[in-house]
Amino acid sequence: GFSTVSADDAAAVLADAPDELVVLDVRTPEEYAEGHLEGAVLVDFYDADFADQLGELDPDVPYLVYCRSGNRSGQTLPLMEQLGFGSASDIDGGILAWADAGLPIVAG
C-alpha cells in the first residue's frame, strides 16, 4: 500500500527494513550532494523523463520516498501507484523533518 509516515516512523522502518527496501530521493543532484539518507537512490523529480526513470525501477519491492519538505515525494506516490508499484511510503516533512528529528544524513 501507499502511506505517509513521520521521520521517526521512517527511521524505525529502515532499522527493521527488508533487504529489498529502496530509499528513493526525488530531489535534485545538488540537494542530494548536500546531504541524503544513507543508500538513497536519486531520481530527480524535475527531470523531463522522471516518470520514465521511475518506470525502470522494480515495482515489486517496497520504497521509502523523500524530498526536501514532502511536496515532491507526496506527488511521486500517486505516480508510482499509476505505474503499478505495490508499496511506497513518503516521509512527512521530508529530509527537513528527518534532520529535525536528529536522524543521520550522509553528504556527498
Regions found by a protein language model. Give the residues of each.
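Rhodanese-like catalytic fold shared by cysteine-dependent sulfurtransferases
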Residues: 1-21, 29-64, 71-108
